[in-house]
Curated annotation (Swiss-Prot):
Residues 26-63 form the LDL-receptor class A domain. It comes from Rattus norvegicus. PROSITE patterns: G_PROTEIN_RECEP_F1_2, LDLRA_1, LDLRA_2, LRR. Residues 1-408, 465-486, 549-577, 651-660 are extracellular. This is Relaxin receptor 1. Detected in brain cortex, and at low levels in testis. Ca(2+) binds at residues 45, 48, 50, 52, 58-59. Belongs to the G-protein coupled receptor 1 family. Glycans are attached at residues 36, 127, 264, 272, 325, 368. The keyword Cell inner membrane does not apply. GO terms for molecular function: G protein-coupled peptide receptor activity; G protein-coupled receptor activity; hormone binding; metal ion binding.
Amino acid sequence: MTSGPFFFCVFIIGRYFTLGNAQDVSCPLGSFPCGNISKCLPQLLHCNGVDDCGNQADEDNCGDNNGWSLQLDKYFANYYKLTSTNSIEAETSECLVGSVPMHCLCRDLELDCDEANLRAVPSVSSNVTVMSLQWNFIRTLPPNSFRKYHDLQKLCLQNNKIRSVSVSAFRGLHSLTKLYLSHNRITFLKPGVFEDLHRLEWLIIEDNHLSRISPLTFYGLNSLILLVLMNNALTRLPDKPLCQHMPRLHWLDFEGNRIHNLRNLTFISCNNLTVLVMRKNKINHLNEHAFTHLQKLDELDLGSNKIENLPPNIFKDLKELSQLNISYNPIQKIEVNQFDYLAKLKSLSLEGIEISNIQQRMFRPLINLSHIYFKKFQYCGYAPHVRSCKPNTDGISSLENLLASIIQRVFVWVVSAITCFGNIFVICMRPYIRSENKLHAMSIMSLCCADCLMGVYLFVIGAFDLKFRGEYRKHAQPWMESVHCQFMGSLAVLSTEVSVLLLTFLTLEKYICIVYPFRCLRPRKCRTVAVLIFIWITGFIVAFAPLGNKEFFKNYYGTNGVCFPLHSEDTGSTGAQIYSVVIFLGINLVAFIIIVFSYGSMFYSVHQSTITATEIQKQVKKEMILAKRFFFIVFTDALCWIPIFILKFLSLIRVEIPDTITSWVVIFILPINSALNPIIYTLTTRPFKEMIHQLWYNYRQRRSVDRKGTQKAYTPSFIWVEMWPLQEMSTEFMKPDAFTDPCDLSLVSRSSRLNSYS
């Protein structure tokens, strides 16, 4: 923005191409032609980086070159062609401005004094046409600083330390067309400071400290086309005709200021304005007639402000508008007919806006719309006539499939099958393992039921992925708002929280039995049943509470296609964010810490009790087995929960997380415990392994009998005794005759528990 060649390059790159003869081909709604051939492709295959048409037509014209790039084409192309031709013809390497200051360079009538340690404007020949004084130490521009330079056309004063500009500093610069004052410390410009600059076309005052302006500030700028006031400290614009003395102004840029509202009279005289940029301000209110007189406006950028409400007729008079950006505003509601008058609109940006009442009717009048940008890719289904809709995916789903990745589509079934089969198998086999501690068995059965719900959740997600295969964009938003999605999300959270609480309870039970074997702390039947009921009730409350208060939680489970609320920040509800943090960084994190501490204490306690044992080598071996088992339990918990803790913490501090992470967490990380708990707590335990060995032994015995026909097989009971924990075993069974001392009994008790892990 600081030189002509830059804008010329932007113009060349941003040229607009039409679609050729594509309009001659008739395609169904949601599909678009492949250039001048009769082939049609759906919206999702256009501008995806792949030549799906075969003639590259689906990848042509994908750039959004509407708005300011077209204005460069219209207003500056011919000018640069003419000036560049003249400069080539007249170019010479000889210096024609006489003597120049030290550290300065001269060529033809151009003076380059960049980084020359200047503290004032140098004095050179009056015929100089270009003067660049960038990166110096000029602090003030006194009166008549440039008065003798009548032929000066371009003046660059960027990156100095200018604080004060005299009202007559630019007097006499009747030929000046471009003035750059960017990156200085200017706080105020007096009325009439540009009075003599009748030919000035570009005025760039970017990155200064201007706090106020008035129409008189720009008095005399009759030829001004481009005015850039980016990144200043303006808090308001005058409620007077700002363009009163700039009748030819086409481009006005106020990006990065602190403007709070736009008044009705501010732009009343800006009849020729084609580009208005107001992004990154603090605008929270728009008067309904603020843009009424901008009937030639081609681009309006109101992005990244604090606008909550759009007046119904705010865009009514913008008949020529081709690009509109209202993204990243906390807009509460967009009227169905909000864009009805924007028939020429080609690009619409609605990123970062939750459109609760979205429908096709909103965008149907926008017959020329070629690019649209949403917060959620699911909204693209409501603009099927728009060729380029972004984003194409949220990292989990795509316009085509609920699960975007083929790996996820396959493994959702694999993980679901493993989880369901493993837990159902344990539930079915548990009655055949007669546990001396029925309360422990009851807890394990309850854990399997909770883990099985995770498998059901994954199964349903896989089923709906199959149902929507190839046309998910049509069903995306209704699916995420549906009762099915809300219920399955609740089921996943119920499974997760009940599993977490049950694992914590089982761990504390083991901890008490091993570390305090002779204290009366063991839960009885009524107490255990009460704890299990309490855990399930708590899980139901945590999981289903968001469904009971939509105003507080918004669409808590419907922020993504898999219906899991890992990133509750997407809901736009502070309450939902706090609730999610309490669950993932409160309940679950505390539970994980308790489990790690308890298993560490258990291992230490068993290790201390076996130091005095006579069979040291046996005890060391048993300790190693115990250590491995404890490590595996803690490791699987850590593998499941630590990534979730990290992701939740990063999202809480607003660190950008790749969109694809959520789906991988839900399908591969979250079900780890649900899939492995049956293995850890049943299938690898000593009673179960002994039962399997006994079944194999019986099978071999029967085969032997069948072969011999005479020998009768010994067939023990199919029911096996589970040896751990030994809470309900009789005293006679627990206490050997050789030990009568409580300390020795403690050793035996702990050793018995140690044996049960092997």
